[in-house]
Amino acid sequence: MYKKIKLRDQQISELINLESKRQNSQIELIASENYASEDVILANGTSPSNKYGEGYPGKRYYGGCTFIDQIEKIAIERVKKLFKIEYANVQPYSGSSANAAVFAALLKPGDKILGLDLNAGGHLSHGYKINFSGMFYSGISYFLDENELLDYDAIEKIALKTKPNLIICGYSAYSRKIDFARFRQIADKVNAFLLADIAHIAGLIAAGQHPSPVGYAHIITSTTQKTLRGPRGGLILTNSKEIAAKIDKVVFPGIQGGPFFHTIAAKAVAFKEALEPWFKEYCAQIVKNASHFASEFIKKGIRIVSQGTENHLFTIDVLSSYNLNGKQAQILLESVNIITNKNTIPNDTLSPFVTSGLRLGTPAMTSRGFKEQEFSQMAEIIDFVLRKKELNALEIKEIKKKVKILTKNFPIKKSYWP
């Protein structure tokens, strides 16, 4: 899809073109990555990039906001329709910015945040000590059970003991469905706010492929670039008028200045795409592909965290299955043009810079048209590479040839419209 560009800045032009070539020629299995449509990318590089406009539609601190006001209003209305919710803020620059806004709106410094342990699939911004969320707030962790599943009774016990001010559900490497209703019960018992961080599963929720937190979570945050297939950015949703007012005040003037109107325009385009019937079909295929992909490894005797998946991702325990750490596995696969990421697993004994796991996701290659058959091929290739550990020149050449055939047969698409 990506056309060669020619800038007067030849150095940057060449690097952009090399990155486009890399994306076209490699298999992308990082669960948090996707391919935005050409419409989204074009909208993200247009004239609203030049416009400054602190504040909200109709209440800006600058003149000349007639059209950007309309753009932001459209983005808000579309995302509200998409998630069937009353209030939305589309200004956050990222998912972490959205989380920071929620904490600042609802908590005081030192208040307690209860989130999933990072090794078990949580996120840095859910109270981890080296992140702002753990520096300014008191992070407390809950864990998975012996089957590597959420143990709601155990989470409730931790909540009753520690009395958190905010409980977070929503993860970066958890492959099972989340019971938002049960989480709300727990939150209510300790008078805590419930935040659903749906950054990874937002598209699946919008398409009906995962239960929605709307009606259960007091507040919802997300990115827009993962399963929503939009530009890089964040958003905040709620049904509470009171919470919405607090959020708006914190996003601006609390933690951000002028919004990125070019990105808000691109978000609006992505939300329109996500409202189409074919987006539901796409998300259904993501889930089918992930389930099939994981089952192919399980058939080969490979250990998958929680023994499968119900969403778009899963994590292989490469240490016990292949006697490799996650970093080694990632490097090996990249040598044959398959892009993945090392990832911690529950109770990981290795550092986050090495890890025992390898996370795999299906959104990006499903965007290119992969179905179960292609993911069967990927499982065969990945299993072969990781079992071999050291590939000779001929093996590397042969695998790269197979990858090249797949990427040529399934190029990055300009548009997802039928």
From Swiss-Prot:
It catalyses: (6R)-5,10-methylene-5,6,7,8-tetrahydrofolate + glycine + H2O = (6S)-5,6,7,8-tetrahydrofolate + L-serine. It is an enzyme of class 2 (transferase). It holds the Pfam family SHMT. Its main location: cytoplasm. The modification N6-(pyridoxal phosphate)lysine is found at K226. Its EC number is 2.1.2.1. GO terms for molecular function: glycine hydroxymethyltransferase activity; pyridoxal phosphate binding. (6S)-5,6,7,8-tetrahydrofolate binds at L118, G122, H123, L124, S351, P352, F353. Pathway: One-carbon metabolism; tetrahydrofolate interconversion. One of its GO terms (biological process) is glycine biosynthetic process from serine. Its cofactor is pyridoxal 5'-phosphate. PROSITE patterns: SHMT. It is found in: Cytoplasm. Keywords: Cytoplasm, One-carbon metabolism, Pyridoxal phosphate, Transferase. InterPro entries: PyrdxlP-dep_Trfase (IPR015424), PyrdxlP-dep_Trfase_major (IPR015421), PyrdxlP-dep_Trfase_small (IPR015422), Ser_HO-MeTrfase (IPR001085), Ser_HO-MeTrfase-like (IPR049943), Ser_HO-MeTrfase_PLP_BS (IPR019798), SHMT-like_dom (IPR039429). GO terms for cellular component: cytosol. Belongs to the SHMT family. Homodimer. Catalyzes the reversible interconversion of serine and glycine with tetrahydrofolate (THF) serving as the one-carbon carrier. This reaction serves as the major source of one-carbon groups required for the biosynthesis of purines, thymidylate, methionine, and other important biomolecules. This is Probable serine hydroxymethyltransferase. The gene is glyA.
